[in-house]
Amino acid sequence: YVVYVKNSPNRTQEPSAVLPNPFGLKNMLGNVMEYCSDWYAPDAYSKMQDGAVDPKGPETGTEHVVRGGQFSDDAADLRSAARGQTEHDAWLKTDPQDPKSIWWYSDIRSVGFRVVCEPPEGTVR
């Protein structure tokens, strides 16, 4: 169901390499970390009130959140709640564009993105 350190040849794998989860989705954990629009702050959770619904984190920042673990992680690190941060400047070092892109991370092959969609109106959440 996941691509991680014990079943990857130290690189990403095609979606066909894993089985779908009960929702029919693949690669929700492992393979690549997912780039999120939330800004990263190491203390973001400690500043939230208990019971917060869909917390957004800080309004500004310098690095974004990445989640879910990657192909070189141990199984214990592959969780939806696993949270790290981008390393923007380091990941752009060999970007050939001038000026540098704010989105294209040519040096990091272990980050993807999460597709988010709303369920149809009237369905159970």
What are these regions (language model features)?
Residues 8-11, 28-125:
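Surface-exposed recognition segments
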Residues 1-9:
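Short, charged, amphipathic alpha-helices and their helix-cap/turn boundaries
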Residues 18-21:
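Short, small/polar residue-rich loop motifs at catalytic or cofactor-binding pockets
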